[in-house]
Curated annotation (Swiss-Prot):
Protein name from the UniProt record: Elongation factor 2
Main location: cytoplasm
Coiled coil (residue ranges): none
Subcellular localization: Cytoplasm
Diphthamide sites (modified residues): 699
GO cellular component: cytosol; ribonucleoprotein complex
Recorded catalytic activity of this chain's protein: GTP + H2O = GDP + phosphate + H(+)
The organism's place on the tree of life at top rank: Eukaryota
MF terms in GO: GTP binding; GTPase activity; ribosome binding; translation elongation factor activity
Length: 842
């Protein structure tokens, strides 16, 4: 255990080469928090006895009750490496004390926005995978997010105790299952990795994969075993590491290494990994679990494990846990893997800077981030807000990328919409205190240099969820985070007692601060809407709202799904609309945008802020757009970045540029509330064909053009075979074979369609993947558990928007029923207005 003081930590923060910022990511219930415990215990914060049960990182009451992690929490660990290990580190280091900032993030898919916030401030990730279940859908999602942020992964294969005790596998089977898991992780890595990172695949023989059990507190890497044997046999450690994985065999008779499975007499040889690594572990397990009292002391002596007085009386699992913890302590293996293989901020920021910074790659701040320079101007990214014990106040949680942040320092607080040189979304305020985040506690410090993760007090009123802090007036923002999930499930919230309304409004503000991916807004009907990524996410948000943020009893409507409005074909005739004073006319047509273009816009590949020519080239080369059209995109909508476009196809129109702003504003308005039932439009492209304008500027102001453009857009939209789109989840369900039938029956009832079904090799488990409309997903988990006797566990991720085939304008069709219900709820007329209402005759 380390005697651990804040001053020690503060001095470590200055040697940035010895800092590691890393997050722990994994599928739900693969054991992140449990593994994190053994690390925290090593750094001397939990007492040794409680580790494995403390789940120190789950700071919230509901996390401990549900046994899942909801928010990502940060903690700093201190580790000293032996000199021989420090020699092997590929990057520069000073001395052998290391500071590891670790963020434990949730695995449940509804909270993947928390994961994004955690990834942004770290440089490396520990990916935890369950031996038995292997790589699941969420493992892939978070790993893809990490690689997208240029983060280097290392892998820990967890729950090996399950394979040994529950499934009783043989050594060769265990090796094969390890090797399959490593392979499937590497497939994901090679698919999504950025070339700049170089080869970031994981190799057990290079020590980037650990195997172990978080619950029992043991883990090992091949490097550790290679070190043991290298001393014993006097061989080179690196050679030994390569031999302990893959197809290499040791022939005990001839004392020679070979890569053939059989010896000269055709006898089967044992794989080196099984013989040297798994054998001692298997023998310990067998001796202890079969209560062979006489074998145990012999084995312990061979492996140099000393038990203290009362530990000798233990037996069964308790003894197993004690022995394995002493033989292969999890913290040592993981800390060694983290320190040896993950990059320091100095290394990482060199290749992450361009991706983090919005401005040009050659300006002073970008260069400072590349160097991770503590003496430059401050560049600090706040990735999320953490509620304090004090009701309604938040710590800003983030990372210093350049410069040094001090208590009492005056900084420019730039929100996500800030543009250099303008005054919008900008505050200049002083930071009250700088604190170290330590899981459940915070420790105040004076200042914090570049490359470290930090909490700030006193700026929570000025930032909504994330933003950039800087001392340089010309600095651009750090790039906004891309969330892999979108809020598609909404509820309306009202107070039971009308006097509590102000508290609700205040509570909603705090809620949207504390969760990076929740949307709160007030609908036109005066309802307060809360939107979340799924059922569980919403449930947690509303519980927070009622108990913490607002603190008043609430009435909550049944959940509603967000739809989108779209078109199928080009408008059947040109839509024309005249301005209220009859002096201006706009002619346009609407047509659909290809799905891949919409997806490229939504994922940020085609970006409204990109350079015009570069964007046009991408659209022409990859998506087959006409170059002149691609250059004449006026705007994206809604909110200036949605998947709808206005394209100017006019020829030689006078005064056209003067009305551009009005047209853009009208388009934002029209796409935010479509004509069918006031939902956002998606994949609609409006081509402006011709405009006739009045010669006097006074007769073509915003008041004339905006309503005209909106009416024209609606008319063109309704003339182009309108359809509605519903959100669809990708569901992954793991279950034993006997339960597969139950899954199919529930999915059929819920309009689900099965995409694939496969058995995981070496286990009795099946994985079923299916598409399930979000609309049908409420209560799905409960019904599934009933139908399968609680053996099936679904994971749902928003996957895509699916167009409903039926006609939304026909009130008897499926789509029509949805539209009518929504229009009633919004308080509109029940019948959708025809295109004639928005169309003007010449």
């Amino acid at each position: 255990m380390v005697a651990f003081t804040v001053d020690q930590m503060r001095s470590l923060m200055d040697t940035v080469t010895n800092v590691r910022n890393m997050s722990v990511i994994a599928h739900v219930d693969h054991g992140k928090s449990t593994l994190t415990d053994s690390l925290v215990q090593k750094a001397g914060i939990i007492s040794a006895a409680k580790a494995g049960e403390a789940r120190f990182m789950d700071t919230r009451k509901d996390e401990q009750e549900r046994g899942i992690t909801i928010k990502s929490t940060a903690i700093s660990l201190y580790s000293e490496m032996p000199d021989e290990d420090v020699k092997d580190i590929a990057q520069n280091t000073e001395g052998n004390a290391f500071l590891i900032n670790l963020i434990d993030s949730p695995g449940h898919v509804d909270f993947s926005s928390e994961v994004t916030a955690a990834l942004r401030v770290t440089d490396g990730a520990l990916v935890v995978v369950d031996t038995v279940e292997g790589v699941c859908v969420q493992t892939e999602t978070v790993l893809r997010q990490a690689l997208g942020e240029r983060i280097k992964p290392v892998v820990c294969i967890n729950k090996v105790d399950r394979a040994l005790l529950e499934l009783q596998v043989s050594k060769e089977d265990l090796y094969q299952s390890f090797s399959r898991t490593v392979e499937s992780v590497n497939v994901i890595i090679s698919t999504y990795a950025d070339e700049i990172l170089g080869d970031v695949q994981v190799y057990p023989s290079k020590g980037t994969v650990a195997f172990g059990s978080g619950l029992h507190g043991w883990a090992f890497t091949i490097r550790q075993f290679a070190q043991r044997y290298a001393k014993k046999f006097g061989v080179d450690k690196v050679k030994m590491m390569e031999r302990l994985w893959g197809d290499s065999y040791f022939n005990p008779k001839t004392k020679k290494w070979t890569n053939k499975e059989t010896d000269a007499d055709g006898k089967q040889l044992e794989r080196a990994f099984n013989m040297f690594v798994l054998d001692p572990i298997f023998r310990l397990f067998a001796a202890i679990m079969n209560f062979k009292k006489d074998e145990i002391p012999v084995l312990l002596e061979k492996l140099e494990i000393n038990l203290k007085g009362d530990e000798k009386d233990q037996e069964g699992k308790a003894l197993l846990k004690t022995v394995m913890k002493k033989f292969l302590p999890a913290a040592d293996a993981l800390l060694e893997m983290i320190v040896m293989n993950l990059p320091s901020p100095v290394t990482a920021q060199a290749y992450r800077a361009e991706q983090l910074y919005e401005g040009p790659a050659d300006d002073a701040n970008c260069m400072a981030i590349k160097r991770c320079d503590p003496k430059a101007d401050l560049m600090l990214y706040v990735s999320k807000m953490v509620p304090t014990s004090d009701k309604g106040r938040f710590y800003a949680f983030g990372r210093v990328f350049a410069g040094t942040v001090r208590s009492g320092q005056k900084v420019r607080i730039q929100g996500p919409n800030y543009v250099p040189g303008k005054k919008d979304d900008l505050f200049v305020k002083a930071i009250q205190r700088v604190v170290l985040m330590m899981g459940r506690f915070v420790e105040p410090i004076d200042d914090c240099p570049a490359g470290n993760i930090i909490g700030l007090v006193g700026i929570d009123q000025f930032l909504l969820k994330s933003g950039t802090l800087t001392t340089d007036e010309t600095a651009h923002n750090m790039k906004v985070m891309k969330f892999s999930v979108s809020p598609v499930v909404q509820v309306a919230v009202e107070v039971k007692n009308a006097n509590d309304l102000p508290k609700l409004v205040e509570g909603l503000k705090r809620l949207s601060k504390s969760d990076p991916c929740v949307l709160t807004y007030m609908a036109e009907t005066g309802e307060h809407i809360v939107a979340g990524t799924g059922e569980l996410h919403l449930e947690i948000c509303l519980q927070d709202l009622e108990n913490d943020h607002a603190g008043v009893p609430l009435k909550i409507s049944p959940p509603v799904v967000a739809y989108r409005e779209t078109v199928e074909t080009e408008s059947s005739q040109t839509a024309l609309s005249k301005s209220p004073n009859k002096h201006n006319r706009i002619y346009l047509k609407a047509e659909p945008i290809e799905e891949e273009v919409s997806l490229a816009i939504e994922s940020g590949k085609i970006n409204p802020r990109d350079d015009l020519k570069a964007r046009a080239r991408v659209m022409a080369d990859e998506f087959g757009w006409d170059v002149t059209d691609a250059r004449k995109i006026w705007c994206f909508g809604p909110d200036g970045n949605g998947p709808n476009l206005v394209v100017d196809q006019t020829k030689a129109v006078q005064y056209l540029n003067e009305i551009k702003d009005s047209v853009v504003a009208a388009f934002q308005w029209a796409t935010k509330e479509g004509p069918i039932f006031g939902e956002q439009m998606r994949s609609v492209r409006v081509n402006i064909l011709d405009v006739t304008l009045h010669a006097d500027a006074i007769h073509r102001g915003g008041g004339q053009i905006i309503p005209t453009m909106r009416r024209a857009t609606y008319a063109g939209f309704l003339l182009a075979e309108p359809k509605i789109q519903e959100p669809v989840f990708l569901v992954e369900i793991q279950c034993p074979e006997s339960a597969v039938g139950g899954i199919y029956s529930v999915l059929n009832k819920k309009r689900g369609q099965v995409v694939s079904e496969e058995q995981r090799p070496g286990t009795p488990l099946f994985t079923v993947k299916a598409y399930l409309p979000v609309n049908e997903s409420f209560g799905f988990t409960g019904e599934l558990r009933q139908a399968t006797g609680g053996q099936a566990f679904p994971q749902m991720v928003f996957d895509h928007w699916a167009t409903l085939g039926s006609d939304p304008l026909d009130p008897t069709s499926k789509a029509g029923e949805i539209v009518t219900a929504a229009r009633k709820r919004h308080g509109m007329k029940e019948v959708v207005p025809g295109w004639q209402e928005y169309y003007d005759k010449l």
